[in-house]
A protein has these predicted regions:
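Non-catalytic, conformational "gating/processing" segments within enzyme and secreted inhibitor domains
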Residues: 103, 142-306, 330-357
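Internal alpha/beta scaffold segment
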Residues: 305-331
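Extracytoplasmic/secreted cell-surface and envelope-processing proteins
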Residues: 126-133, 310-312, 346-348
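Short Gly/aromatic-enriched secondary-structure transition segments
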Residues: 132-136, 251-258, 313-321
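Residue-identity detector for glutamine
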Residues: 35, 43, 52-55, 84, ...
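Detector for small/aliphatic-rich hydrophobic stretches
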Residues: 2-8, 13-200
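Short amphipathic beta-strand starts and helix->beta connectors
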Residues: 95-103, 285-287, 320-323
């Protein structure tokens, strides 16, 4: 089984924003979720492109057909936009992780970062909201991007062979008479993102609760995202994503052999290499690779820059459209592949990364 920690984001905003979760809380934390996102009986709430809720009415099959047609085009635009955002995030995150050390790996989860920032964008206004939308959804409107993001997150497969779990939460400091959260914002994130809402004193018990619940939501893959809560923090938004999938066709023992894996700096290390033959070949200018299927329709994608081109150089020239088209246009050329068994972990503060974006 291949286990991938998709990621957790704790993003401290201007007023100390960020947060988390659902059971096993200390006695100082209060579940406020039931107070938000409610609607009167007989009303149907829909989330608009800007994340606001409103009543939806049946406008007939013609409008529905047009909506589905438009959604197809919007979703395609989102796929390109999301890929570009992902590459932008990886490039800037890698710069922070490397910090002059080429031997370090970088793991980021664009979906987790995007969801947490989308919740923050929902509560923003004016230039801040516009700028956040431009970063999150390059090349398309933030309203359309937000709509598709919510639909995709709710439709991703979650089954025995491929577990996908996402948790969104808002924590509000209750021991603060100065800060009062906007109820419309809390209603929106509860309705649009199924976020839970908690009140807490923002002391050491709150810090433990957040870490404990992130660990729970990620099946133990992430055990800590906070070591302390700043005095000025008044609200937390936290998104946690966990992905745990099996290969559609597992490697058998005869396909796993000891081999030497060479890193970018030329150093070699002994690894267990998983060999296979595939017809899902990927090629682009200055790189080639392959796809391999997980269960439930998920794919693992590996790309290798051509010899003589560093990973940083390749990432700098790669754009979302090229990357997306490469994956869409895989060809059935038979190739032999070797993939090392590996684990990876990245711990980084995203403040500088997001500022660079």
């Amino acid at each position: 089984m291949e286990r991938v920690t998709a990621g957790v984001l704790a993003a401290v905003m201007a007023l100390g924003m960020t947060g988390c979760a659902n059971s096993g809380m200390s006695g100082t934390t209060t579940d406020l979720t039931g107070q938000y996102g409610t609607k009167e009986e007989g009303q149907t709430e829909g989330t608009g492109a800007n994340g606001q809720t409103g009543q939806a009415e049946d406008t007939g099959t013609e409008d529905t057909a047009m909506e589905e047609k438009d959604l197809g085009a919007i979703r395609e635009a989102f796929e390109y936009s999301y890929t570009q955002f992902s590459l932008n995030l990886l490039r800037e995150s890698r710069k922070q992780v490397q910090n002059g050390e080429d031997a370090k790996n970088t793991m980021v989860c664009p979906l987790s970062v995007m969801m947490a920032l989308e919740m923050a964008r929902t509560g923003a206004d004016g230039d801040t909201k516009q700028q956040m939308g431009a970063v999150l959804y390059p090349g398309m409107s933030a309203e359309d991007g937000s709509m598709v993001l919510g639909r995709i997150c709710k439709s991703l497969p979650d089954a025995e062979g491929a577990r996908f779990h996402m948790s969104d939460s808002v924590w509000v400091k209750t021991a603060d008479d100065v800060f009062v959260p906007d109820e419309n914002f809390l209603d929106t994130v509860k309705t649009a993102y199924d976020a839970e809402v908690f009140g807490a004193p923002f002391d050491e018990t709150t810090c433990r609760d957040i870490n404990r619940l992130v660990e729970q939501e990620t099946d133990g893959m992430i055990t800590e995202i906070l070591d302390q809560i700043p005095e000025l923090a008044v609200m937390y938004l936290v998104n946690a994503v966990a992905f745990d999938a099996e290969w559609e066709t597992p490697y058998d023992e005869s396909q796993i052999q000891d081999a030497t894996f060479y890193a970018e700096d030329g150093s070699g290390q002994e690894v267990s290499m998983m060999y296979d033959t595939t017809y899902r070949y990927l090629t682009m200018e200055h790189a080639e690779g392959f796809c391999r299927a997980y269960k439930e329709g998920y794919d693992f994608v590996a790309l290798l820059p051509e010899e003589g081109l560093s990973l940083s150089e390749w990432l700098e020239e790669l754009d979302g459209e090229t990357f997306h088209e490469t994956i869409r246009q895989e060809n059935d050329t038979m190739i032999e592949t070797g993939l090392p068994q590996f684990t990876g972990e990245t711990d980084l503060e995203l403040k500088d990364t997001l500022t660079a974006l």
